[in-house]
Amino acid sequence: MLLMMIDNYDSFTYNVVQYLGELGAEVKVIRNDEMTIAQIEALNPERIVVSPGPCTPSEAGVSIEAILHFAGKLPILGVCLGHQSIGQAFGGDVVRARQVMHGKTSPVHHRDLGVFTGLNNPLTVTRYHSLVVKRETLPDCLEVTAWTAHEDGSVDEIMGLRHKTLNIEGVQFHPESILTEQGHELFANFLKQTGGRR
């Protein structure tokens, strides 16, 4: 199965590639400014992963265009910047996080849906980000699948989202980090998804 990894010039990209390869995926990595949508389509990928990166979704090359073009055609997973790109592609706002996270772990609560199916709840994850998708601006077509919580249990920041009808999901944290629990299992759940629609 050919998996296209859109690399947003991030040092973590090849850690993600390694995890996916260990799970049996054939991964082709392209930089976010290396190919047009037509060139990507010509390679006939079965699924796409949009990588983390040091920039904002607006600066992530072909990432948003690829999400919108392939939406409904094949499964798409966004990691960190890729997650934010999904949020922005469908109309959400990406804003400064309340607190910058650089290699910090957090317990994340989830709805046992999609890539989170069967994972620990809460799940300990590793976060490297200064931006988040603003919950109040999430469009109707997207739903929150995972979040950090305030002390009273209310939702703090979005840590996972997915499209309500299409096979498109994002995670704000880094499943490929050694300190994230069940990272392989999360990616394995993505690799089980087929087709563009749920």
From Swiss-Prot:
| Binding positions for L-glutamine per the UniProt entry | 53-55, 84, 130-131
- An example Gene Ontology cellular component term from the record? cytosol
Pathway assignment reads: Amino-acid biosynthesis; L-tryptophan biosynthesis; L-tryptophan from chorismate: step 1/5
Residue ranges annotated for the Glutamine amidotransferase type-1 domain, each copy included = 2-198
Q: Which GO terms describe its biological process?
A: L-tryptophan biosynthetic process; tetrahydrofolate biosynthetic process
Q: Which Pfam families match?
A: GATase
What is the consequence of disrupting this locus?
Answer: Cells lacking this gene fail to grow on low-ammonia medium but grew on the high-ammonium medium.
Q: CDD domains this protein is in?
A: GATase1_Anthranilate_Synthase (cd01743)
What is the catalytic activity of this protein?
Answer: chorismate + L-glutamine = anthranilate + pyruvate + L-glutamate + H(+)
According to the UniProt entry, its GO molecular function terms are: 4-amino-4-deoxychorismate synthase activity; anthranilate synthase activity
Q: Does the keyword Nucleotide-binding apply?
A: no
Q: What is its EC number?
A: 4.1.3.27
What is the top-level taxon of the source organism?
Answer: Bacteria
Q: NCBIfam families in the record, alphabetically?
A: PRK08857.1, trpG_papA
Q: What does the annotation say about its assembly with partners?
A: Heterotetramer consisting of two non-identical subunits: a beta subunit (TrpG) and a large alpha subunit (TrpE).
What's the protein name? Anthranilate synthase component 2
